[in-house]
């Protein structure tokens, strides 16, 4: 019995000695315990960058850090291993126990990585907008000199010269043409409003052009619609109507200025006129009485 126990103890010691003698290399300052060990990822935290791998042979949990991953998924931005993924790694001796190093996929392929790890955006490697080339100014000057020489030799028309201009000049008009784009609705609405204004003026004053111009101006700038120009129209129409009425009444009635003068003179002369008027009235009454008395006397004498 004692011999059997001794042989069983010697076998594990021999296995450990072989395992220790096989990996002669070291990873940094850490001693390598085993190489090319297969295991299953128990869990891995992408944010903290560490996790544990369960060895398939000994069912032991081995600590793994993201820096130990040798071949990462090229599509992933961060180094990581996925939960439940089968990986191949080396076991080294760490400060607090066994650690994994040189982590790869089976047979040295890149690991799949965690599904929570961010993907790498390839289009960010190349900028969308690039500056002009270094020899851009020299080429531009050469092009200008060549264009001038061609113009002097062949003397092309204006359309040809515009077509031969460099492309960088064509970029500027769109920036300047944005301003009139914002004003186009006003220009497009202006004639419509002008027609409406002309239709409204045709009922009252079609012959004169001032009201129509004012309406066109209002259509171009609508903020002046509620301003004083609207109040001026009835005044002008009223003045025109007064002028027409005055033209009709000039034949029958004197102008208003003369009326005021007559009334004013009448008020001034009013205190002096009563005496004279009374005297005239008395004289007229006496003469009328005499005239009436004389025919009566003549009639009486005739009888």
Curated annotation (Swiss-Prot):
Q: Which UniProt keywords apply?
A: Cytoplasm, DNA-binding, mRNA processing, mRNA splicing, Nucleus, Repressor, RNA-binding, Secreted, Transcription, Transcription regulation
Region: Disordered, residue numbers: 1-28, 98-303
Q: Where is the composition biased (Low complexity)?
A: 133-143, 173-187
**For bias kind Basic residues, which ranges apply?**
122-132, 220-229, 258-270
Point to the regions of Basic and acidic residues compositional bias.
271-284
State the SMART domains in the record. Answer: CSP (SM00357)
Which residue intervals make up region (C5-methylcytosine binding)? 43-48
> Which stretches make up the CSD domain?
39-103
| Entry's Gene Ontology molecular function annotations | C5-methylcytidine-containing RNA reader activity; DNA binding; miRNA binding; nucleic acid binding; RNA binding
Where in the cell is the protein located?
Cytoplasm; Nucleus; Cytoplasmic granule; Secreted
Q: Where in the chain are disulfide-linked cysteines found?
A: none
Where does the record place Polar residues bias?
A: 1-12
Quick check: keyword Lipid biosynthesis in the entry? no
What Pfam families does the database record attribute to this sequence?
A: CSD
| GO terms for cellular component | extracellular exosome; histone pre-mRNA 3'end processing complex; nucleus; P-body
GO BP annotations, alphabetical order: embryonic morphogenesis; epidermis development; miRNA transport; mRNA processing; mRNA stabilization; negative regulation of cellular senescence; negative regulation of translation; regulation of gene expression
Q: Its family?
A: Belongs to the YBX1 family.
What job does the chain carry out? Answer: DNA- and RNA-binding protein involved in various processes, such as translational repression, RNA stabilization, mRNA splicing and transcription regulation. Binds preferentially to the 5'-[CU]CUGCG-3' RNA motif and specifically recognizes mRNA transcripts modified by C5-methylcytosine (m5C). Promotes mRNA stabilization: acts by binding to m5C-containing mRNAs and preventing mRNA decay. Plays a role in the maternal-to-zygotic transition in early embryo by binding to m5C-containing maternal mRNAs and preventing their degradation.
Instruction: Please give the name of this protein.
Output: Y-box-binding protein 1
Say which species the protein is native to.
Answer: Xenopus laevis (African clawed frog)
Tell me what gene encodes this: ybx1
């Amino acid at each position: 019995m004692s011999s059997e126990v001794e042989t069983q103890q010697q076998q594990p010691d021999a296995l450990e000695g072989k395992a220790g003698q096989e990996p002669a290399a070291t990873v940094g300052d850490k001693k390598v315990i085993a190489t090319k060990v297969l295991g299953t990822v128990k869990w891995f935290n992408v944010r903290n960058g560490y996790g544990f791998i369960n060895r398939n042979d000994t069912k032991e949990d081995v600590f793994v850090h993201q820096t130990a991953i040798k071949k990462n998924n090229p599509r992933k931005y961060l180094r990581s291993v996925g939960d439940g993924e089968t990986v191949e790694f080396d076991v080294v001796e760490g400060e607090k126990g066994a650690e994994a190093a040189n982590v790869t996929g089976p047979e040295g392929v890149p690991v799949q990585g965690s599904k929570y790890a961010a993907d790498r955006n390839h289009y960010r490697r190349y900028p969308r907008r690039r500056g002009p080339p270094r020899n851009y100014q020299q080429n531009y000057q050469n092009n200008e000199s060549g264009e001038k020489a061609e113009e002097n030799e062949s003397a092309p028309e204006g359309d040809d010269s515009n077509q031969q201009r460099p492309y960088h000049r064509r970029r500027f008009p769109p920036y300047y043409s944005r301003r009139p784009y914002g004003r186009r609705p006003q220009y497009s609405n202006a004639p419509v409003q002008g027609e409406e204004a002309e239709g409204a003026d045709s009922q009252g004053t079609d012959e004169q052009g001032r009201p129509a111009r004012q309406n066109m101006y209002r259509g171009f700038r609508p903020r002046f619609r509620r301003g004083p120009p609207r109040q001026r129209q009835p005044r002008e129409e009223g003045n025109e109507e007064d002028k027409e009425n005055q033209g009709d009444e000039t034949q029958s009635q004197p102008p208003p200025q003369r009326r005021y003068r007559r009334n004013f003179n009448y008020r001034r002369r009013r205190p002096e006129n009563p005496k004279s008027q009374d005297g005239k009235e008395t004289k007229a009454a006496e003469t009328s009485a005499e005239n009436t008395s004389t025919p009566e006397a003549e009639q009486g004498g005739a009888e």
